[in-house]
Swiss-Prot record:
Function: Antimicrobial peptide.
UniProt tissue specificity: Expressed by the venom gland.
Stated name of the protein: Antimicrobial peptide Meucin-49-1
Locations listed in the record: Secreted
Claim: Signal is one of the keywords in the record: yes
Family classification: Belongs to the non-disulfide-bridged peptide (NDBP) superfamily. Long chain multifunctional peptide (group 2) family.
Length: 75
């Protein structure tokens, strides 16, 4: 390999090492938590949890509703 290629590889490696060393996991998690997708997922999760809690707390409403009886077919 010639010296120019080795120099480029060295510089790129140093840039990558600098990025990895400056990476903070806490800021990454904070950025993910504030993202639009995370907000949508949290809202959907809260809605599902609320629905589940309502079903668990008031199961008599579901039991009071009679199940539809299938009509017998005539031949």
């Amino acid at each position: 390999m010639n010296k120019k290629i080795l120099l480029v590889i060295f510089i790129v490696t140093m840039l990558i090492v600098d990025e990895v060393n400056s990476f903070e996991f806490g800021s990454f998690i904070k950025r993910m938590w504030r993202s639009k997708l995370a907000k949508k997922l949290r809202a959907k999760g809260k809605e599902l949890l609320r629905d589940y809690a309502n079903r668990v707390l008031s199961p008599e409403e579901e039991a009071a509703a009679p199940a539809p009886v299938p009509a017998k077919r005539r031949r």
